[in-house]
A protein has these predicted regions:
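C-terminal cap of thioredoxin/glutaredoxin-like
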Residues: 5-6, 16-30, 106, 110-233
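Residue-level preference for long, well-ordered alpha-helices that form the structural scaffold
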Residues: 10-13, 66, 70, 161, ...
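A broad, low-specificity signal for short, low-complexity segments enriched in glycine/proline
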Residues: 1, 50-51, 64-68, 141-146, ...
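Short active-site neighborhood of thiol/selenol oxidoreductases, capturing the structured segment around
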Residues: 1-12, 17-21, 36-39
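Glycine-/small-residue-rich active-site loops that bind phosphorylated ligands and cofactors
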Residues: 12-13, 96, 191
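Structural alpha/beta surface segment adjacent to cysteine/selenocysteine redox centers
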Residues: 18-125, 227, 232
């Protein structure tokens, strides 16, 4: 079973949802037969005017709430992260454009380092307060998970993997995905939001039962003559 996850690096519930899925897979009997594919989604594709701006203040303005309300929301998100072993130092977080991070995530996926990239980028943003749109920060993180420095430089100095990012976003539009995280299982079953671990375990069991290939059951007792790879009889 393949699970495609539409996610953005700066989405806190994507971070939580990814952790919930990891915990759910630890309880799923067929986890070794699950392939997780991270897909790109930009919550705000616009260029960041001030990468050092106060994220909480920006969120307050965006959603028409007071500073106190925005801080309370950030605190609740931080508590939700803490409950699953993640850390959100929201006072140190700043706005970021994630397009280049997504491009590097596609490189990482090609090199078998997809999960490592997702974890490194999200931890850098949420826990360490690093500027995830900055090329030097991205370079350090990408090399840190084992990507080749020259290849990382080539990506950051070009538009390599831009088409793959846009293709993911176009597919999200086809599916009608407007919020993340969104999990698409076996190309036809979707789950939206950072669902509880128990819910994800149930979903995995249900999708497995619907897609599992079972042996054919003969409807007659006698076998007629036939040909196989070793000849006819």
């Amino acid at each position: 079973v393949r699970i495609d996850i539409w996610s953005d690096i700066v989405c806190p519930f994507c971070y939580i949802g990814g952790r919930h899925l990891q915990l759910a897979l630890e309880r799923f009997d067929h986890a070794e037969e699950v392939e997780v594919v991270w897909r790109s989604f930009e919550l705000d594709p616009r260029p960041v005017e001030d990468p050092h701006a106060d994220l909480t203040e920006q969120l307050a303005a965006k959603y028409g709430m007071s500073r106190d309300q925005a801080e309370a929301n950030q605190q609740r998100v931080g508590e939700a992260m803490e409950a699953v072993g993640l850390e959100f130092n929201w006072r140190d977080a700043h706005p970021a454009n994630t397009f280049d991070a997504h491009r590097l995530a596609h490189l990482a996926a090609e090199r078998g380092l997809s999960d490592q990239a997702q974890t490194a980028f999200k931890k850098a943003y949420f826990t360490d307060g690093r500027a995830i749109g900055d090329h030097q920060v991205l370079r350090d993180l990408a090399i840190g998970i084992g990507l080749d420095a020259d290849e990382v430089d080539d990506v950051l100095s070009s538009d390599r993997y831009a088409d793959q990012v846009r293709a993911d976003e176009s597919q999200a539009q086809v599916y009608g995905i407007t919020a993340v995280p969104t999990f698409v299982l076996a190309d036809q079953y979707s789950v939206s939001g950072a669902q509880p671990v128990d819910t994800l375990v149930d979903v995995l069991d249900q999708v497995w039962s619907l897609t599992e290939k079972t042996p054919l059951v003969p409807v007659s007792g006698a076998a007629g003559e036939s040909c196989g790879v070793d000849g006819c009889d």
